[in-house]
């Protein structure tokens, strides 16, 4: 006997489907039914329908009669209601498919119905919402947009999975429009698309120069379209608006999966062995949303101008030529979408001498205002204005004015509202802040110290810095601007509460943990406070007039110094089985290799950046995560601290092992000899004394390490949205909130929000911040660079409470603090470091 399905298709009769349906009917009313009764009812149904061809509806009618005849009235009622509900769902599905009238729409809706069977995600609900947006005469695109909007607006704290349904609908709409565009262009394969994009100057020619057509075709087979279902609506919407390749008329020509594959092709193109194998591994880690690369890498890999790095750090020299060179460096970096950290601690203070003339110097503020204007003038690829953090030491004579750069009161000629101030603190400052706020604090000019004492105070740290600082304080030849620690603390906290800044850089903690202290010092961090690498200023050597080819040219020679570059990626811990050590090591090994490849494949906006990046081969592997909530761990708990300690130790072990293996294959970074990696001090300082760690230390000493710096936790504000996770190390601001985008309110839901995870998501502003600080201290032991850690405060906080958090952070060994986020304060996120 054959059965005609509702679609019109014919299939062979299967009695198991009938008995299965009856079992479900009995189970739904908690009623038992023995096999004999089931067999009897099945026989009754089969006698009634006889041989030949029957419809599904005919058979289901007979099942109802058999249940009633057997006296199973409750089960029969449940079965009837089930049929009615299924009928309503079919009607809703057909209504929606008919309104859109696109091939594949009904299959998409069937998939949604299958994957989201819960009552709150019924297609009848979607159809009801959609009917409110439906208008006569809508075309296909308009109807799909209305359907997406309906799903978005159904997203609530109680029904969060609508954001995944909305994403599927958005992707369907996008792929329909893309298919029309590709058809018009005659593009029928991935290779055709790469050829077309390359010809239009949208794709780097180097991809097709490195891979044969056969390799491109094989790589195209790696694409898994079903991984689009991992996107939330917010993530996919952001991906399509900002990251996939678009024509000059802003028409997208690349799918998210093709974007991931294009990045993988770029990052693997110089691999000598198993190149396509690495393409696949890079593609898999990205498309499974286990790893996110930094925004510049996601945006620019595979493109002609492949600037892949996030942030840059420059040491501003104390000379007119050097200051303007640093400002020009910032302009060049900003032009290609990078953010900047600028250390102004060497620049002479207001009233200092110039060429022996006392009182001639105007101080750092006027130069910082030039940085501010450059940030506004040189926007990031026309998308947003440039961004720079400027760092100044806590003992610099211009510090009080510096701390008022962004505040709302005072002389506007001394303001720079578009840059982000940051202060570099020695241990002595926090020790005095803890013990006696009325202690004197002496502010001095670095140029005056260098002139009188013959050394730069900022070139030292720890006990040696403190000894020299007191030596300067006691030297009557050096002028001082003496205030109390309380005066500085008051200015810092006032600015922090009003503006979220200054950022905090604990210079002694940073430099004590620097594995490359044998080669220099770390003066400051970057725009997002997660990078800590050796720095030194660019120096002018000579300027000569020479003749070349009959032309007179001016040749300026410079010594490149150490111009820091950040190459970032993040592990999405909520999407990774972190308890599986083998899996974690393999994944970390893959992303470390990808980041190391970035160094060689990068387009550098400045030669200084290229020189430093290839000298140290520094990378910054970080995390973004909803790992704790997913595992049922409360933020404010010792379990949190213990779990973070274990996980970050394993990540660190995996990263070091991977980098050392790369060194065995490709060689160590240039400055390995004499480093803490080579001497073993890196492991001793962190108390890594288990047999496993001792073995790894021995391996590193023997075969080297590829990357001078390995771990740095960036804020990941944008890329965390792509991967549907929480940003960086932060707790959630709210479990559910509405965000306005282009006049539309978009719902945002905490990742994997459910009754099981609900109570593990606590609003960042009501969390006891001491737990966040302590957790940061626990993680810091395993992170050789720093972490973008925010403090969240409310209007109820007193200044003394905020100060206690700063002091606690210093006591816990926290290297940097990013924003102080007041509940009423909006701060600007760094897009570049969104890894």
List each model region and its residues.
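Terminal amphipathic helices with adjacent charged low-complexity linkers/tails
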Residues: 78-79, 83-86, 162-194, 425, ...
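Function-dense linear segments that define catalytic or interfacial modules
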Residues: 245, 251, 263-275, 279, ...
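Internal maturation/activation junctions in enzymes
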Residues: 285, 303, 587-608, 633-716, ...
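Core nucleic-acid recognition elements
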Residues: 9, 31-261, 277-283
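Polar, glycine-rich mid-to-C-terminal structural blocks
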Residues: 404, 419-492, 496-499
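Alpha-helix capping and helix-loop boundary segments enriched in small/acidic/polar residues
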Residues: 6-13, 100, 251-254, 273, ...
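Catalytic alpha/beta core of large soluble enzyme barrels
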Residues: 212-220, 224, 228-237, 529-533, ...
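Short, surface-exposed, low-complexity cationic segments
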Residues: 14-32, 105-119, 261-268, 727-732
């Amino acid at each position: 006997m054959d059965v005609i399905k509702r679609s019109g298709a014919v299939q062979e009769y299967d009695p198991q489907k009938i008995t299965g349906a009856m079992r479900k009917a009995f189970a739904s009313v908690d009623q038992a039914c023995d096999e004999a009764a089931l067999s009897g009812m099945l026989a009754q149904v089969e006698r009634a329908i006889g041989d030949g061809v029957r419809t599904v509806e005919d058979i289901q009618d007979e099942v109802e009669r058999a249940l009633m005849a057997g006296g199973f009235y409750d089960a029969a009622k449940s079965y009837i209601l089930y049929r009615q509900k299924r009928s309503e769902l079919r009607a809703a599905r057909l209504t929606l498919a008919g309104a859109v009238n696109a091939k594949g729409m009904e299959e998409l809706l069937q998939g949604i119905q299958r994957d989201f069977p819960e009552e709150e995600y019924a297609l009848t609900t979607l159809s009801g919402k959609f009917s409110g947006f439906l208008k006569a005469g809508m075309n296909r695109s308009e109807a799909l947009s209305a359907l997406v909007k309906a799903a978005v607006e159904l997203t609530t704290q109680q029904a969060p999975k609508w954001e995944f349904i909305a994403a599927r609908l958005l992707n369907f709409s996008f792929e329909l429009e893309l298919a029309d565009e590709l058809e018009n262009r005659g593009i029928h394969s991935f290779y055709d698309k790469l050829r077309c994009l390359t010809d239009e100057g949208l794709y780097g020619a180097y991809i097709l120069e490195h891979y044969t057509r056969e390799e491109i075709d094989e790589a195209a087979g790696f694409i898994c379209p079903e991984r689009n279902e991992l996107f939330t609506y917010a993530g996919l919407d952001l991906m399509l608006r900002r990251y996939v390749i678009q024509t000059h008329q802003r028409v997208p020509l690349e799918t998210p999966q093709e974007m991931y594959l294009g990045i993988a092709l770029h990052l693997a193109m110089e691999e000598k062995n198993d190149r396509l194998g690495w393409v696949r591994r890079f593609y898999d880690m990205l498309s499974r949303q286990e790893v996110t690369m930094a925004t510049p890498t996601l945006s620019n890999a595979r493109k002609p101008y492949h600037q892949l790095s996030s942030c840059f750090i420059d040491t501003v020299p104390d000379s007119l030529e050097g200051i303007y060179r640093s400002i020009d460096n910032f302009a060049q970096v900003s032009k290609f979408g990078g953010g900047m950290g600028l250390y102004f601690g060497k620049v002479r203070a207001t009233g200092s001498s110039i060429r022996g003339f006392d009182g001639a110097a105007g101080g750092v503020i006027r130069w910082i205002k030039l940085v501010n204007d450059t940030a506004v003038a040189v926007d990031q690829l026309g998308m947003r204005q440039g961004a720079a953090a400027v760092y100044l030491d806590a003992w610099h004579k211009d510090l009080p004015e510096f701390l008022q750069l962004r505040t709302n009161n005072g002389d506007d000629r001394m303001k720079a509202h578009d840059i982000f101030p940051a202060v570099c603190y020695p241990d002595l400052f926090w020790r005095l802040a803890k013990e006696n706020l009325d202690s004197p604090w002496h502010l001095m000019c670095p140029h005056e110290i260098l002139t009188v004492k013959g050394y730069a105070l900022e070139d030292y740290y720890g006990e040696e810095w403190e000894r020299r600082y007191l030596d300067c304080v006691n030297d009557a030849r050096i002028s001082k601007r003496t205030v109390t620690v309380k005066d500085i603390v008051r200015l810092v906290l006032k600015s922090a509460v009003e503006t979220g800044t200054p950022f905090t850089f604990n210079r002694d903690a940073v430099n004590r943990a620097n594995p490359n202290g044998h080669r220099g010092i770390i003066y400051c961090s970057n725009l997002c406070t997660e990078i800590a690498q050796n720095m030194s200023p660019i120096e002018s050597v000579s300027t000569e007039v020479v003749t070349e080819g009959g032309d007179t040219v001016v040749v300026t020679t410079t010594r490149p110094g150490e111009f820091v570059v950040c190459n970032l990626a993040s592990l999405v811990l909520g999407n990774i089985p972190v308890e599986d050590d083998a899996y974690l090591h393999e994944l970390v090994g893959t992303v470390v290799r990808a980041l190391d490849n970035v160094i060689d494949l990068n387009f550098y906006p400045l030669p200084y950046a290229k020189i430093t990046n290839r000298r140290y081969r520094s990378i910054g592997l970080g995390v973004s995560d909803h790992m704790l909530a997913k595992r049922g761990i409360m933020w404010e708990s010792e379990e949190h601290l213990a779990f973070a300690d274990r996980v970050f130790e394993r990540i660190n072990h995996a990263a070091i092992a991977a980098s050392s293996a790369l060194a065995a294959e490709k060689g160590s970074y240039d400055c390995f000899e004499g480093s803490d990696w080579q001497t073993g001090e890196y492991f001793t300082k962190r108390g890594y004394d288990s047999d496993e760690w001792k073995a790894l230390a021995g391996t590193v000493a023997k075969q080297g390490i590829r990357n001078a710096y390995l771990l740095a936790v960036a804020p990941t504000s944008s890329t965390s949205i792509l991967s549907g996770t929480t940003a960086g190390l932060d707790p959630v601001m709210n479990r559910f909130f509405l965000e306005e985008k282009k006049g539309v309110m978009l719902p945002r839901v905490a990742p994997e929000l459910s009754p099981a995870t609900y109570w593990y998501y606590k609003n960042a502003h009501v969390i006891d911040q001491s737990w966040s600080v302590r957790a940061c201290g626990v993680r810091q032991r395993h992170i050789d660079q720093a972490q973008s850690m925010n403090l969240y405060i409310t209007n109820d906080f007193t200044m003394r409470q905020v100060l206690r958090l700063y002091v606690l952070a210093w006591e816990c060994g926290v290297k940097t603090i990013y924003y102080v986020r007041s509940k009423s304060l909006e701060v600007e996120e760094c897009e570049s470091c969104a890894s």
